[in-house]
From Swiss-Prot:
Active site: S183, D393, H451
Pfam families, per the entry: Peptidase_S10 (PF00450)
Protein name in UniProt: Pheromone-processing carboxypeptidase KEX1
EC numbers: 3.4.16.6
Biased composition (Low complexity): 536-549
Glycosylation-annotated residues: N64, N121, N293, N378, N440, N448
Species annotation: Candida tropicalis (strain ATCC MYA-3404 / T1)
């Protein structure tokens, strides 16, 4: 018994002598660290290409059980240019997961046919830390008991997310901030940006100003009714339907009804009141539904009958009309539904992932919020706005974006004063698009790309961040202005040598030229750049300085080593003293040792056996990613001795472990592959687990979703 107590005491001293894992108490972000994914170390090479990752479901409001899921990627290569920049990426819907952005567009990974990650050479995390957020709550892996219904609430909730996020990553709070996203994020992002700018002007005590530098909206759904007027001209101009069609009269009639609604909106545009005819876009949006129906090629096979609404050069089955695209979506969905992956992503509440949530879309009526187009003029007075568009998209096409800009007043003028003043965008010696730019708003039309520009042209899309941050060259060729950007690796060398520091740090700005753009070039695809080879034989990961506080240093300082030696010396002396006492105790004459009656088994040994059995209850490990729960000194000792050997991320399924997945219904119709979710339009039925939820405004009408 006495010996057991001494052994426990010695082990306890060993535990106390070893410094606690750095960040276990002061760095709560450690429990969100992602250490593995299927295919990560098999397919992503060299090792330096593996990004530092954090993900999990971050609690915002415990009173209504609202948690936002985020997935953050940090460049593992030490890079001064990327270490002070943060990009928040949002997909649309409403109710479509930003995992589309992470795994199909701007993130470092794509998913292959084996449902494993492979590397994306065009990842935006090479420009700055990028965080993908599933929002509003109920989208993707986010969850809540109370769904939100309006755009103002989107902004409030996201500011709360940022507040909680910076508690996890306080070293990043002074970073430059960019927001980027696509489609219905054209509503989200302006509202969030506007809320941040207002917050910065009304800081409370101890608040830190958010350094918002710019927003980028790809194929954005910003002015719904106005943009819907572009559908019929688009189909005519691209030869997708002609005026001799038997249903032409019906199409023209609906177009005229939409035009009357838009005229009414224009007449009251400057009013602060929210008018029902402006926030209800059902009539105008139905034009596209009819066009897709009437333009079917009924002689084609069933899989190629309908025009793909996201890329008019592609075909799909009807009525999917693009909802089965991108084809890799059939790999993404089962990948995110794997228990192994949910384990790796640190989910604390298991949720069956779906690309788009019909429930979120139905609850999110946005009936009390003006369309985001109203916010652009004020935002542009403070930060640059980039509106980029894939030229092949129908649903949020370039003509629709230009049509609302033509009417918009910003910077004291209406629209672009000279639409012929187009700037050629050159990337990797190829003309990839053109730019219109005035008064802090830029429109960029990108050739040979769809609704999801980063999916088609990942390298080109990353160069958008070079445009918004001013990392480009400006030249003139044949009387036309050109903005020149470079592939990763070339940009710093070329710009560092040829552009003065003060020029390369400026965002794109207005410069005079009145020459028209030439005809669109032939289709070109930029070559993807390869990740740089490893320059060191060391197998240790390189961690960005912004995350250094989470990772133990490879070598301790001399003073730390000296302290360890003193501690170990003290422990050795104590151990030696205990040993001498024990030997003296055993060496005493047996005649003077009183032996109490007892069973054959030693009580002390029996306790040791019992403690060993209890070790199965402890999950603590010195390599555990999350902060350990409170423990007594004996429990710490036992945990230190035995420890858990799992090398995966924290995984704590809710409930008793028997909980079933939460299920949603697929959006839309006509999807032949059960693994493929609808990409955007329509939510016809409730999810299988449709439960009563609280909303802030009764039962809003069902709305189309734009991803």
């Amino acid at each position: 018994m006495l010996l057991s107590v001494f052994i426990i005491l010695i082990n306890t001293l060993f535990v106390l002598a070893i410094p606690p894992k750095e960040g276990s108490d002061n760095n709560p972000s450690k429990k969100y660290l992602v250490t593995d994914l299927p295919g990560l170390y098999e397919n992503v090479k060299p090792k330096i290409s593996v990004p530092l990752m954090f993900s999990g479901q971050l609690e915002l409001y415990p009173e209504n059980n609202t948690h936002y899921f985020f997935w953050k990627f940090v460049d593992s290569e030490l890079n001064q240019d990327t270490s002070k920049k943060t990009i928040f990426w949002l997909n649309g819907g409403p109710g479509c997961s930003s995992m589309d952005g992470a795994l199909l567009e701007t993130g470092p990974f794509r998913i292959d046919e084996n449902e494993k990650v492979i590397y994306n050479n065009g990842s935006w995390h090479k420009f700055g830390d990028i965080i993908y957020v599933d929002q509003p709550a109920g989208t993707g892996f986010s969850f809540t008991n109370e769904y939100i219904t309006d755009l103002d609430q989107v902004a409030w909730y996201f500011l709360k997310f940022m507040e909680e996020y910076y508690k996890l990553f306080p070293n990043e709070i002074n970073n430059e901030i960019y927001f980027a996203g696509e489609s219905y994020a054209g509503q989200y992002i302006p509202y969030i940006a506007d809320a941040i700018l207002k917050r910065n002007k009304n800081l409370k005590e101890n608040d830190v100003k958010y350094d918002l530098k710019g927003i980028l909206i790809g194929n954005g759904w910003v002015s719904p009714n106005q943009q819907s007027l572009s559908y019929l001209p688009f189909f005519i101009n691209h030869g997708l339907i002609d005026k001799s069609h038997p249903r032409w009269g019906s199409l023209l009639s609906k177009h005229e009804k939409c035009q009357k609604i838009v005229n009414k909106i224009d007449g009251h545009f400057d009013e602060a009141d929210v008018h029902p005819y402006e926030v209800n876009s059902a009539t105008c949006e139905s034009i596209l539904t009819d066009l897709l129906n009437y333009s079917q090629d009924r002689e084609s096979d069933s899989d190629h009958r309908c025009i793909n609404m996201y890329d008019y050069t592609l075909r799909d089955s009807y009525p999917s009309c693009g909802m089965n695209w991108p084809f890799e979506l059939k790999y993404v969905a089962p990948f995110l539904r794997k228990e192994e992956v949910m384990h790796d992503l640190n989910l604390v509440d298991l949720k069956y992932w779906r690309e788009c949530s019909g429930k979120v879309g139905r609850m999110f009526g946005a009936r009390n919020s003006l369309p985001a187009v109203h916010l652009l003029p004020n935002i542009s007075q403070e930060i640059p706005i980039i509106l980029f568009n894939g030229a092949n998209d129908i649903i949020c096409n370039s003509d629709g974006v230009l049509s609302y800009l033509d009417k918009l007043q910003w910077g004291g003028k209406v629209g672009f004063t000279n639409k012929d003043d187009q700037i050629n965008w050159i990337y990797d010696n190829k003309e990839v698009g053109y730019i219109l730019m005035e008064r802090n708003i830029s429109f960029i039309n990108i050739y040979n790309s769809s609704h999801m520009v980063p999916y088609d042209l990942p390298d080109v899309s990353r160069a958008l961040m070079d445009l918004v941050s001013g990392k480009y060259e400006e030249k003139e060729k044949d009387g036309k202005r050109e903005f020149i950007t470079y592939p990763l690796g070339e940009v710093r060398n070329k710009l560092g040598q040829e552009i003065p520091a003060d020029e390369s740090s400026k965002p794109i700005e207005d410069k005079p030229d009145d020459k028209p753009i030439e005809d669109k070039p032939e289709e070109t695809k930029p070559e993807q750049t390869k990740p740089e080879d490893e320059t060191s034989s060391s197998t240790s990961e390189i961690i960005p300085t912004s995350e250094a506080s989470f990772i133990p240093e490879p070598e301790e300082s001399t003073s730390s080593k000296f302290t360890r030696l003193i501690q170990l010396g003290v422990i050795f002396i104590i151990f030696w003293g205990v040993y001498i006492l024990y030997v003296s105790y055993r060496a005493r004459p047996s005649s003077i040792i009183k032996k109490p009656a007892r069973s054959t088994n030693s009580s002390g040994r029996k306790k040791n056996v019992q403690w060993a059995d209890q070790l199965n209850r402890f999950e603590e490990d010195e390599n555990e990613l999350g902060s350990p729960p409170p423990q007594g000194i004996i429990a710490k000792t036992i945990s230190k001795i035995t420890g858990n050997t799992s090398n995966r991320g924290r995984y704590a399924p809710a409930g008793d472990g028997s909980r079933e997945f939460t299920d949603d219904i697929e959006l839309g119709e006509g999807i032949s592959d059960p693994n493929v979710d609808e990409f955007i339009i329509g939510s016809d039925d409730d999810e299988d687990d449709d439960e009563d939820v609280e909303t802030h405004e009764g039962n809003p009408k069902k709305t189309e979703s734009k991803s």
